[in-house]
């Protein structure tokens, strides 16, 4: 599923080789070219009107939601099914960002369920590529008040208090609900998140002031969702390109208590392959497998899906 964005680019087509087809109201199909700004490619989605379709095998042609309706806990495991129900719990995307991604925030599960009858949105970003000068904004450099945040969004100075990260290929960022975040520059990401599209746009770098580029701003709606404390460095994992400064602990948050003591998260073998834990959270665990040979995983031994 392709998604046009004003900050998108052409890398999903030209570099990843993705093929997107759009249909007009008459059913005519057109292949999306490199002149179209595609910001997102939804690789695995169970989002109602936007569902992934199985490409091959004996279930080819079925959507993920149809398979979930039929096989229930056999797909995701009993524990996950009991919590998430019939919706596949993860949404996986590729992002191609070539301009400024709006300053935004996502709610947690409790708020999302109470106000919108949806899941919240915890997510991770894995940096596939980042050009020199690219920036990720995540959290604040110091504690601020809701009033200061509101005023700075209105007078276009919010970037002065946002924590700035200069990402490198292989870095991992864990964006917890309530964390204000944005991007500036040329960067390609893998995004793994809960199955939710609840995003509250807080500031759009001036685009909101131009009738040609204006998109809805949700500042008042989201003001009580924001974590106004300084950025939690446990949420950022520097990849191998940082050399001696690289991190080998998984991303987490202090609330998850996985940064307060030693863990056995070094590289470990799984059937002879190298596995690294990138993120540990209540919503998901994400690992990186460095494969040199075919890998066979017997899912019956796990209580969840792989």
Can you name each region flagged by the protein language model?
Residues 1-144, 204-251, 267, 286:
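Transition-metal
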Residues 103-106, 166-185, 192-194:
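Conserved metal-binding segment of the jelly-roll/cupin
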Residues 123-125, 182-206:
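A short hydrophobic beta-strand segment most commonly corresponding to one strand
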Residues 144-174:
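Active-site glycine-rich loop that binds ribose-phosphate moieties when present
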Residues 248-270:
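Histidine-centered metal-binding segments
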Residues 274-290:
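C-terminal accessory segment of soluble enzyme catalytic cores
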Residues 290-306:
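A conserved acidic, glycine/proline-rich C-terminal tail/linker
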């Amino acid at each position: 599923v392709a998604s046009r964005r004003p900050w998108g680019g052409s890398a999903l087509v030209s570099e990843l080789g993705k093929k997107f087809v759009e249909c007009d109201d008459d059913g005519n199909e057109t292949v999306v070219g490199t002149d179209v700004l595609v910001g997102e490619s939804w690789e695995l989605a169970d989002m109602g009107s936007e569902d992934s379709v199985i490409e091959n095998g004996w279930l080819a042609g079925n959507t993920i939601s149809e398979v979930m309706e039929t096989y229930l806990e056999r797909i995701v495991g009993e524990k996950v099914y009991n919590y998430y129900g019939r919706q596949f719990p993860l949404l996986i995307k590729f992002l191609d960002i070539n301009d400024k991604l709006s300053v935004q925030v996502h709610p947690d599960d409790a708020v999302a369920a109470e106000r919108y009858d949806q899941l919240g949105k915890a997510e991770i970003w894995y940096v596939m590529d980042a050009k020199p000068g690219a920036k990720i904004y995540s959290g604040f450099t110091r504690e601020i008040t809701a009033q200061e945040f509101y005023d700075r969004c209105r007078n276009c100075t919010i970037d002065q208090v946002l924590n700035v990260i200069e990402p490198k290929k292989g870095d991992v960022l864990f964006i917890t609900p309530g964390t204000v975040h944005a991007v500036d520059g040329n960067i390609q990401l893998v995004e793994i998140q809960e199955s939710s599209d609840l995003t509250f746009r807080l500031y759009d770098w001036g685009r909101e002031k131009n009738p040609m580029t204006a998109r809805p701003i949700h500042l008042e709606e989201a003001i009580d969702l924001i974590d106004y404390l300084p950025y939690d460095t446990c949420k950022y994992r520097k990849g191998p390109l940082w050399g001696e400064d690289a991190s080998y602990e998984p991303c987490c948050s202090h609330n998850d208590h996985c940064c307060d003591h030693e863990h056995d998260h070094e590289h470990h073998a799984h059937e002879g392959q190298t596995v690294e834990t990138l993120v540990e959270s209540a919503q998901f665990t994400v690992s990186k497998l460095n494969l040199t040979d075919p890998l066979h995983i017997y899912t019956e031994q796990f209580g969840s899906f792989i």
